[in-house]
A protein has these predicted regions:
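Acidic, glycine-rich flexible loop/linker segments
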Residues: 241-242, 250
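Short glycine-rich, acidic/polar surface loops and turns
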Residues: 366-368, 411-419
């Protein structure tokens, strides 16, 4: 009867073949025999949709009981979707030659709601190889506590001026997280260890870190969002009092927002930004491998990977490269290259110059649109605008006679792409053009990425 209070009867589930019942039931804000609450009904539906385990549009069906009109039975009618993804990537640069990678991710592992991720990356030159494994449990023992464990191993040829041979990195750790006040705001802490070993140097590095973070996430789908915000702020404290021989603090802020511009959710605008700052602690210098370098499909497209790397990066040195002929002790002549900005610097001043930055900022704006009126079109277009830069220590700019960039002094690029959605996944073709090309730089760059579902 309209106006009378109603109570929840049975909460039933249909259509879950792989997903276990308790994984679904723990997302219900409504409970059996409690007073019906429209807000809790909406939140329950949002929780199920945001899992990413089911086709979008999950609705809890309500049906009154015969002879008990104040009792409502609820039915979650589900249709499971693919929860495994793979991503393959291939590229080329003067630094690493041909490179590639493969990432496999299985969500809802064995129907438990857990996620397992495996990845491998390689490069033709510089002996680059990297392997990662991560296991995530979003609801430990069906509680609101989330946890993850991870481990990785990588090998790469030292490309810095230190020439320390092959660098082997072994890292491992775990994290725990919990909601703060409401569902979308979470606090988490990660404890990690990293051992960086060199074949041609005895100065091995051992990092022990703790990273508290606050995250807000309201996106409506974990893989293909069309609305919502995802943002986080974290502080990564390395060294004292956690051990190791590196003292370092890093601040990181990330922001991403999605807007659906039409009713069918096919015209989507995405804005993203990130900022990072490295701070020396005590007398421990910032390791070269931890300094910021940007460029490529994940930051500023149209640039080679990590080619934007401060006033003494490879890209900047090419701009000021000059040649001179020197005669060695045996009387043989050799042609040497040098940076014209460093010719009057002393040995101690040269040691202050380092590739990479201690701060970074990256901004991305994307518009994804269909090529036809059919909302199920499998071909989507993309236009984008990227901007970003890194800054090094002020002393480096002074030594090189350069002006330190302001926050909004950025390298910029724009471009377009096509994404082909197939039953096996998404093919991405993206072309980026530099909007501020320098004399020695190529004007553009094409990149191809394969990502998919299984």
């Amino acid at each position: 009867v309209k106006g009378e209070k109603a109570y929840i009867g049975r909460l039933e589930i249909a259509g879950n073949v792989e997903t276990r019942d308790h994984v679904i039931r723990r997302e219900f804000e409504l409970q059996e025999e409690e007073l019906f609450n429209g807000k809790k009904l909406r939140l329950s539906q949002e929780n199920l949709n945001r899992l990413g385990f089911f086709q979008s549009g999950v609705v809890l069906e309500r049906s009154p009981r015969e002879h008990e009109e104040n009792m409502l039975d609820m039915l979650a009618r589900l249709k499971e979707s693919q929860t495994g993804t793979f991503q393959a990537q291939i590229g080329y640069s003067d630094f690493s030659g041909f490179s590639g990678g493969l990432t496999l991710s299985k969500g809802n592992l064995f129907g438990t709601g857990r996620t397992l991720r495996l990845s491998a990356q390689f490069a033709e030159q510089s002996v680059q190889r990297k392997f990662d494994i991560t296991l995530i449990d979003p609801r430990i023992f069906d509680s609101h506590i989330s946890g993850s464990v991870f481990a990785s191993r990588s090998n790469v040829q030292d490309s810095t001026e230190f020439e320390r041979g092959v660098i082997t990195e072994n890292s491992y750790g775990f994290s725990l997280g919990s909601p703060l006040y409401f569902r979308d705001l979470r606090f988490s802490t990660q404890l990690s260890a990293l051992d960086r070993l060199f074949t041609d140097s005895e100065d091995d590095l051992f990092k022990r870190s703790v990273a508290p973070a606050i995250t807000y996430n309201s996106v409506n789908h974990p893989i293909f969002p069309s609305s919502g915000i995802k943002t986080s702020f974290s502080v990564i404290q390395t060294g004292t009092p956690f051990g190791g021989n590196i003292q370092l603090r890093e601040l990181r802020f990330n922001y991403q927002q999605f807007w659906s511009l039409n009713l069918s959710n096919t015209l989507i605008l995405m804005a993203k930004g990130r900022w990072g700052l490295l701070q020396e602690q005590g007398n421990s210098p910032i390791p070269s491998e931890d300094r910021y370098r940007i460029g490529g499909i994940d930051s500023v497209r149209g640039h080679y990977y990590y080619n934007i790397s401060g006033p003494f990066g490879t890209n900047e040195q090419l701009l000021y490269r000059q040649y001179r002929v020197v005669t060695d002790e045996l009387g043989y002549q050799q042609t040497k290259t040098y940076d014209s900005r460093t010719i009057n610097l002393s040995s101690s001043e040269l040691q202050e110059l380092k590739s990479g930055g201690i701060s970074e900022r990256v901004f991305n704006l994307e518009l994804l649109f269909p090529f036809s009126q059919d909302e199920n079109s499998f071909v989507r277009g993309l236009v984008f605008l990227d901007a970003g830069n890194v800054n090094s220590e002020s002393e480096q700019y002074s030594l090189l006679g350069e002006e330190e960039p302001e926050f909004f002094d950025l390298r910029k690029s724009a471009g377009f792409g096509v994404r082909v959605i197939t039953p096996m996944g998404v093919l991405r073709f993206e072309y980026g053009m530099k909007l501020d090309k320098r004399p020695h730089e190529i004007p553009d760059r094409f990149e191809f990425t394969v990502s998919g579902l299984f």
